[in-house]
Amino acid sequence: MERPNSSVAGLYSGLHGNGSVENLATEEEGLRLLAGAASARFGSSAGRGGGGGEPEGRPGPFNGIVTEPDPEEGTSSGQRGGINGQRGTKRKMENEGEDFLKELTLSLMSRRHHESVWWADLEDEFKNGEMNLLYKYTFEQLKTHWLEAWEDFELALNTFAKVALRPDTIYTIKKTVNIRKCAYVLGNGAVVRFQTCDRVAFNCAMQSLGPGLIGMSGVTFMNVRFVVEGFNGTVFASTTQLTLHGVFFQNCSGICVDSWGRVSARGCTFVACWKGVVGRNKSQMSVKKCVFERCIMAMVVEGQARIRHNAGSDNVCFLLLKGTASVKHNMICGGGHSQLLTCADGNCQALRVFHVVSHPRRPWPVFEHNMLMRCTVHLGARRGMFSPYQSNFCHTKVLMETDAFSRVWWNGVFDLTMELFKVVRYDESKVRCRPCECGANHIRLYPATLNVTEQLRTDHQMMSCLRTDYESSDED
């Protein structure tokens, strides 16, 4: 893979080698003028062929004439003409979409930037002993390589570090992409598909010692659309710092993100996925402003997590909390239909939309300013007290394990339509074998519950709602 000739001004990778950007724009303008003249000529010739009279129609683009046929109603020819017209309209819309993507790609590739150095040059300076690269160069000065569909994804990332995808191109991953260096991928809304039998698509391993730049840290993917149909593996397996910014995942029957290190998902969308973001033991996970829709398990936390300003809809499990987390300003609506179990604490429990696994030493999660509507919540026993603050449990059922009944505090929540249930015992006569989120099948004992809503609900005759539990400092 050769680098573009940076000594010639106006040349970019992916363009013609002997034509500059200005010449390319001029040629495109000329082609548009020729197309307009041809359309006008076609309209005038059609008018002459109709017996000397001008056809009824409307002015089209490039001063041409778009005729409007009048098929006979109630006849087969009229129906056939309508079907052909629909096909023509659909084909026209597809062509317009392709033309728009091509123009967008040309516009992005033709922009002038203050890029002056390649990543290979930084590596050479680093090997020669230059230790001030962090202050010598910036992200804007690093040259961008526009990736073509036929190029090797792994080789391009390890060679150029800063790689941009073309919006008018569909990329296909046919083998595992091993990333062992600092990498930054600008997706520009490009679509990435998978045709591989490997278990991992992008393996973000521990990085070797190399140059550092302000604005580039670890592995970053931005504005990429992953269509994961037919791929049953893991899209991202990371043991280093991974940042996903505005990434779209759809129809992933495996795991979208499996992290053993630090992972940050910001503004991402997960639609119809098996597992969205999974943080393993001793991992640090940050999920902000993401959307989870119709997922089986949106988030699984085994280490530490910060979950803020997210939205979930029709997920079987929005959060399976095995570790510790801070859950604030989230909106969770509805739950999917499933009979999945979880055996995280050694006991088989039915998987709920918000599920806190019991642990004798780990504290309760911080739960503030959340909106739950028509959800189910499972609370396992933990150390300390669980006190949700300024959260709305609208038409939500909360199931508390036996030891967790005395460790919850429901002051400061909106509890009009909330129902609280306590597990009294497990009925051994009602045994069911259900699939578990770990991949195996387990036997689940049916719990016998007791409604304790009025016992734990705040006595509103004794405590006024005009108190600090329902107010904030920024209110008037």
Curated annotation (Swiss-Prot):
InterPro entries: Adeno_E1B_55K_N (IPR006717), Adeno_E1B_55kDa (IPR002612), Pectin_lyase_fold/virulence (IPR011050). One of its GO terms (molecular function) is ubiquitin-like ligase-substrate adaptor activity. GO terms for cellular component: host cell cytoplasm; host cell nucleus. Residues 1-20, 42-95 are annotated as: Disordered. GO terms for biological process: symbiont-mediated perturbation of host apoptosis; symbiont-mediated perturbation of host ubiquitin-like protein modification. Pfam families: Adeno_E1B_55K, Adeno_E1B_55K_N. Keywords: Early protein, Host cytoplasm, Host nucleus, Host-virus interaction, Modulation of host cell apoptosis by virus, Phosphoprotein. It is found in: Host nucleus; Host cytoplasm. Plays a major role to prevent cellular inhibition of viral genome replication. Assembles an SCF-like E3 ubiquitin ligase complex based on the cellular proteins ELOB, ELOC, CUL5 and RBX1, in cooperation with viral E4orf6. This viral RING-type ligase ubiquitinates cellular substrates and targets them to proteasomal degradation: TP53/p53, LIG4, MRE11-RAD50-NBS1 (MRN) complex, ITGA3, DAXX and BLM. E1B-55K probably acts as the substrate-specific adapter of the SCF-like E3 ubiquitin ligase complex. Interacts with host PML-4 and PML-5; this interaction promotes efficient subnuclear targeting of E1B-55K to PML nuclear bodies. Interacts with E4-ORF3 protein. Interacts with E4-ORF6 protein. Contains a PML interaction motif that allows the subnuclear PML localization. This is E1B 55 kDa protein. It comes from Human adenovirus F serotype 40.
